[in-house]
Amino acid sequence: MGGAVSAGEDNDDLIDNLKEAQYIRTESVEQAFRAIDRGDYYLEGYRDNAYKDLAWKHGNIHLSAPCIYSEVMEALKLQPGLSFLNLGSGTGYLSTMVGLILGPFGINHGIELHSDVVEYAKEKLESFIKYSDSFDKFEFCEPAFVVGNCLEIASDSHQYDRIYCGAGVQKDHENYMKILLKVGGILVMPIEDQLTQILRTGQNTWESKNILAVSFAPLVQPNRNDNGKHDTVGLPPCAVRNLQDLARIYIRRTLRNFINEEMKAKGIAQKAPPKRKRRRCRRRRINTYVFVGNQLIPQPLDSEEDERMEDDNKEEEDKDHSEALKPEEPPRNLLREKIMSLPLPESLKAYLTYYREK
């Protein structure tokens, strides 16, 4: 699936295309997509394909097309503090974006069939927390991943506000998925080649809406053990954060608010990340043709308008070239600067920065 929008040159360009095509429609979803570079979830040597609107698979590693993830994120109607379950969590790309919207008091769980993919997801999550410039701009609900078949979840597992299944669900498994959902919750999953949004309106009542025609590989059926029974999979616990973790969240929030107030007082607006300029297409000169004997000879049709357009294009190209030559200043991490200026032991400062290296 995919190919609904033009390929981008980088992550921001891809998001611009998804917005223009109305796959991304809300600000929170846009911010999450811009914060997580899709290319970071590709293996080395395959990143050139990261910004195309196409699915990608290598061994057990799989990423759906960007247009699919966009529709899923919009259909889930995510809000801070909700609980989310990703059935077939894969690389963790979607779960990480969801975590940016859920915030620190949400629940973010994923179950994935392949243990090597879970390890890959954990590596990518650790890399995002340690190195991404976006991490300090959000309050994050860190995903927790477990290995297992999502059709073997223990019957006494807790329910969730939002659920997404990233594999084709057969009709006889539809009710199994619905049971995992809280009343008032939203389940998004592919059923019979339709990405479907299901709202649980009551204990035994549901509302369904088809979102998009899709083609997903079906869910892998569970194997029976030596006793002829299925192994059950335990989901991560819904743990309450400890006091130390809560203190870190509120200190970072207070400092972030203080920075925003400082910038407002100075009349400095928060700048959005600079977008790559789209290059203007240069128009061709129009020629007129005259007959000289038996030959058709092209003659340039010079006009003031043609000359003005050519001069404007040249000036813009020269300006873009000169701007490209200017060395870019590295972005300042004001939150980190505030933390490092606090009168605290270095070990506490490191804890407040999540031990990030920049």
From Swiss-Prot:
Region (AdoMet binding motif): 85-94, 160-164, 181-191
Keyword Cytoplasm listed: yes
Example of a GO MF term: ubiquitin-like ligase-substrate adaptor activity
Lipidation (N-myristoyl glycine): G2
Gene3D superfamilies associated with the record: Vaccinia Virus protein VP39 (3.40.50.150)
Active site positions: S64
Record GO cellular component, one term: Cul5-RING ubiquitin ligase complex
Record region (CUL-box): 342-345
Region (BC-box): 240-250
Domain of life per record: Eukaryota
Residue ranges with Basic and acidic residues bias: 319-339
Gene Ontology BP terms: protein ubiquitination
Skewed-composition ranges (Acidic residues): 302-318
Transmembrane regions listed in the UniProt entry: none
Region span, Disordered: 300-339
Domain remark text: At its N-terminus, contains L-isoaspartate and S-adenosylmethionine (AdoMet) binding motifs. Also contains an extended SOCS box motif, where the Cul-box is separated from the BC-box by ~90 residues, within its C-terminus.
Function: Substrate recognition component of an ECS (Elongin BC-CUL5-SOCS-box protein) E3 ubiquitin ligase complex which mediates the ubiquitination and subsequent proteasomal degradation of target proteins. Specifically binds to the methyltransferase cofactor S-adenosylmethionine (AdoMet) via the N-terminal AdoMet binding motif, but does not display methyltransferase activity. May provide an alternate maintenance pathway for modified proteins by acting as a damage-specific E3 ubiquitin ligase adaptor protein.
PANTHER family hit by this protein: PROTEIN-L-ISOASPARTATE O-METHYLTRANSFERASE, PROTEIN-L-ISOASPARTATE O-METHYLTRANSFERASE DOMAIN-CONTAINING PROTEIN 1
Family membership: Belongs to the methyltransferase superfamily. L-isoaspartyl/D-aspartyl protein methyltransferase family.
Protein name: Protein-L-isoaspartate O-methyltransferase domain-containing protein 1
Gene: PCMTD1
